[in-house]
Amino acid sequence: MTKKELKSTRDGFGEGLLEAGIQNENVVALSADLTKSTRANLFAEKFPKRFIQVGVAEQNLASVASGMAVIGKIPFMTSFAIFSPGRNWEQIRTTIAYNNTNVKIASSHAGVATGPDGGSHQMLEDIALMRVIPRMTVFSPADF
């Protein structure tokens, strides 16, 4: 029997995002100043022209992603759950869901196990917030 190497879900996201970018040139990635933490750096290093760093501007992250979807791109936006959807929920509701744009929202660091980041980075309400938005599909991966 072979022992499977365990990886974090954010590592799985980074590898999956990179694979999606290889398979489809319309895939773009956006980050709100947490590129390495969410592992979007794997995509950014391979496809720098298809990566946008919006800085600490989570509301703008959602609006830019929605605009890119309107012109035919497939945006994957990444941040910690406390910031997206925690900080930009209204933009997600209005610019992404209301307009029914094809935006993928990937949030890491949900729950209370945020390590040294502490209470200011804990998010317990992310799934509840997203589930009430019409046309929103929510996945919560457990293993990679």
Give the residues covered by each predicted segment.
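Thiamine diphosphate
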Residues: 1-144
